[in-house]
Amino acid sequence: MAILKHIASKNADYGEAERYLIFQHDEYTQKPILDDEGHMLIREEYYLDGLNCDPFSFAAECMETNAYFHKNQSFNEIKSHHYIISFDPKDRDEHGLTGEQAQKLGLEYARENFPGHQALVCTHMTVIMEVAISMFHIVINSIRKYDVEPQPY
């Protein structure tokens, strides 16, 4: 059974989300893992895509959108939403879920649930209590970049 977690962030540094997704972090302290020279280590396996943005310029593009709409300019505004879906290890072991398949699921979920938003979708493996878990992250700008048709629900 997958677990969904949501975090609303007032942090104006959109690049922090990018760094967390791409680089290795200690799962308990959340601090980046550094090599002998003090450089952050890239995750061994990750898949990264952007919706309505380039994944490697997500931060700059979100700032441009916010400036264009004159939104997210004050400290108290929620700047982004971060969704984390963690899969049960059985999904990998018994059903053959791969990182690529999890990324595809993440992209589908983001397209269906966050139309018009700039979004980062990233899948990676992490080890929690000595168990490897596959998870995907969706980070969206709280401001919708593109208009979408109203939905009937």
Predicted features by range, described:
Residues 1-153:
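N-terminal nicking endonuclease/strand-transfer module with a His-rich metal-binding environment
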